[in-house]
Amino acid sequence: MTRESLAPIASKANTLSESKVSENLMSINSDSGTSNANTPSSVTSNSKPVASSTAAKKDPNAPPQKVKQYVCETCTRAFARLEHLKRHIRSHTNEKPFTCSEIDGLPTGCGRQFSRRDLLLRHQQKIHRNPQPRRRRRSTTALPNPSLSNVSVSTTNLASKPVISLPQADSIDKFRYPKLHAALQAQLANNSGSFSASWLQAQQQRLVSAGNGRETVNASASGAVNPTSSQWSDQRLGVPYGPDSPLYYRRATIASDLRPSVYQHPQLYDFNRPESLSGQLDDESLARMPYSPNAVSRNYAMNMTLPESIPEGYEIDKLDWMSFSESLNLPTFNQPSGPSDVSASFLNLQAMPSPHASPKDSLINKSNSYFFQNPPKSNSVDYTRLDNLEHMRQSCISPSGTNFSPSCYSPESLMQQPLTLSPSSIPSGLPTYAHVNSPLGTEQYPSEAYPPKGYVDMEGRISEGIKEEGISLSEEITDKDQAFASMGYFDSYNFEGVENSNSLNNEGDQMETNFQSEKLDNSNSIPFFNFNSFNNNGANWSSDFNYPVSETSGLLTDNNRNQPPSF
C-alpha cells in the first residue's frame, strides 16, 4: 500500500478518534455538572474541536466573572466586594448601625435599629408612611443626617395626610383661653381633629400677627434679640425661616405658644450665626446667641412644640412632650475692668441630645455667663422639651433641686440627684437675680397631663420629695379644687438649720416670707432664697431667685464689692 492510499484511512481514523474523545468529554461534563474549567488541561488541549465549540457558546460581550476575594472568617463565605462582606458580618455580630431617628428630615423617628439601610428605608415607608424615594448612599457604616434642602412640604400635603388628632380642650383651657377654645372646637368639629389647609392659613395669619405684636412691644431690642424671618434664614434649609418657610408648619404647629404676649419666632435659635461676645469666651461653640454687653435686661422665649406624630414603637406618655414657653429675663450687671471681676449668676439655655431622638432644652445656672450656649454637634431645636435641670456647679443649685419649675418634666431615667450645699458653695458677689415665667396649662392636652409627673400632682401633693444633705423641699397646693384657676403655693426648705418658708394665698396677691437668719453659725453666710408666686388667674408661675453676698467663698473683689446691680 502506498502512502497516498493510506491517507483516507488515517483521516477517517483520526476523525473517529476525535469524535470518540468529544463524546467522552460531553459525557463527563453532563455527569459532573461542571464546565470545561474543571476538565484536565491534557484532555482539552488534545480536543481541538471541543475547544472551538465551547468558545463559540461563550458570549464575547459578557463581563468577566468577579473574583470573590473577601472571605468571612466565621462561615468562610466569600464576597466580591468589601461592603458586602461588612454587611454579611453584621449577621454574625448582630450590629445594627442604621437607626430610625429622622423622618423626612425631622427628628420624629421611632428609634428602631436595622443592620441594612434598605431595611430602614422600607420600615420608614411602611410604618411611618414616608414617601421619600430610596437613594443609594456612599457610606454603609452609619446613617447620616439627611439634607433638608430636598424636602418640600406644603399646606396641601399636610392637609392630605393627617397624622394626629388634636385632643379636646378641658375646662381649665376654657377658663384661660375662652376665645381660643371656641375657635379650636369649631375647627375640630369641621375637620374631625385633623389639619386642614384653611386651618393652617388661619394659624399662619395668627402667628404673623402675634410676632408683629411681640416685635412692636420689644422694638428697642428687636434688632439684636427678635430678628424677623426676613432678616435671618436657615442655612441648613436654604429657605427663609419663618411663616414664609415651607417647613414652618412642621415646626410651629398647634402646640406652639398661642398667646401673643410671649410669642417668639423660632429663628431665635440660629446656631449657625455666632455673634461677637465678651472677651471671657474662649470656646467658639458657646458663642451661639446674639449678645449685647451693654444690654440691661433681655427677654428670651423658648417655644416648645409637639411633633405631629408619636413615634411608632414608643410608649410615650402625654407628659413626654410639652406645649409651653419659658421666658428668661437675663439682667446684666455693670461690668468691672476685666472678666475676672465679674461675679453674677444668670440662667442659660443649653440644647442637649434627647434619648427619644429629639433635642431637648435644659435650664442651667452658671456663674460668669452672659450667653446662651449650645453643643457644636447638637441637633436642631425645632422640637424641644424641658427634660431636666442640669447644674454646672454646686454654687448655682436652686432650692428645688432638679425640678426648676412645675412646668419642667423630668423622667425618672433622667433625674439627677441634687448637689450638696455648704456655706462655702453659696453664690457670692453681688446679689444676683433671675426670673422664670412658665404657663401651667396647655392648649394641647387635657388637664390631667399637668403639672408634669414627678413634681406636683393634680391633687396638690408632691409626687417625689427631694431630700439631700440638709435640703428638704415640700410643696403643697392649698386650694385643690381650683388648681389652675386660682392656685396657692407653699414651699419650704432647711439649710444648715436655717428655716425659710414662702407661702402664697389662693388669690395670688399676697406673699409671705419667713427667714430665720439667727440660726446661722456664720452670720456672713446667708443662704439663698426663692420667691414663688402665681398671677391671679393661675396661668403663670414665676420664681425670683436671689443669691446674697457670701464673704466665705472669697470671690468678691474691690471693684464690685459695693457696686449695685443695674436692671
UniProtKB/Swiss-Prot annotation:
Gene3D superfamilies: Classic Zinc Finger (3.30.160.60). Keywords: Activator, DNA-binding, Metal-binding, Nucleus, Repeat, Transcription, Transcription regulation, Zinc, Zinc-finger. Transmembrane segments: none annotated. InterPro entries: Znf_C2H2_sf (IPR036236), Znf_C2H2_type (IPR013087). Coiled coil: none annotated. It comes from the Eukaryota. GO terms for molecular function: DNA-binding transcription activator activity, RNA polymerase II-specific; DNA-binding transcription factor activity, RNA polymerase II-specific; RNA polymerase II cis-regulatory region sequence-specific DNA binding; zinc ion binding. It is found in: Nucleus. Residues 12-55, 140-154 have a biased composition (Polar residues). Residues 1-67, 123-154 are annotated as: Disordered. One of its GO terms (cellular component) is cytosol. Pfam families: zf-C2H2. Key transcription factor for sexual development. Activates the transcription of ste11. Binds to a stress response element-like (SRE) region in the ste11 promoter. This is Zinc finger protein rst2. The gene is rst2.
